[in-house]
């Protein structure tokens, strides 16, 4: 059955930001075990760019966006433990969050606690849960570790750096400008390198007394991948979790052996939150870190939903810091 009218961003062909359209249509009522959420804030992420350009293929026409926060406006049959009017947030494996209303599976939403705003929650679900699994599950960062974080002033980067510092690690961040370097220093980085100015490998080797870092978190991809491998200590780990500059080059496993028997992984958030229990655990620890002041959510940009294309242009042009949020 059809319900209220809702505006949403859709696209009918892969391409640049210009393919995004704002449309209005009736939103179906929630099916069994679904809730309908009226969004108050929507997170913008690089995965949205991958969906739009076709790097991650999807059926067309398609919506866009994986994370949002808002208010429950309707419950489908069989929903338990949730009420109309409650504040919730979610991250979803299929796009469609760039909208005023959305129906989502009840088991995939989490309640937003007091002390966390809707905009913070929308900016945290994908980026914050990504930081959670990177730091607590892919490699369990602990006191004494030295880590290297690319895009340290970005949405995931700022959360990673703050949380890693709170865990006792020494953080070396890489950013694209002096302005971003200042932001990174204020959010957990002990040392900050500027890409294009500082030689990555020699700088890291100097800072670590030629030992190398325990783990590299690299969301940039092609432009930084090989140099990142040369920054890692013996038996260390390379975590390639994004392709902002393009996919990393293919390498032989022997390249890892030659550099000290390194570990290489390309993790995805959605493999870490398959079960309701995994999602709930990650959200609980993430919100606790925010409420305790260990992680401050930096929302650098806000746009109305109608300007989603501008948000993408700024994100791809590396003109953003922290998280970007759309407001319906």
Where are these regions (language model features)?
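Mid-domain Rossmann-like dinucleotide-binding core that forms the NAD(H)/NADP(H) cofactor-binding site
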Residues: 124-198
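Glycine-rich phosphate-binding loop and adjacent beta-alpha segment
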Residues: 175, 223-294, 328
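NAD(P)H dinucleotide-binding glycine-rich loop of Rossmann-like/cofactor-binding domains
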Residues: 50, 89-153
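Short glycine-centered segments of the SAM/dcSAM-binding site in methyltransferase folds
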Residues: 87, 146, 170, 236-237, ...
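Short amphipathic alpha-helix with an adjacent loop that forms part of the alpha/beta core around
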Residues: 199-210
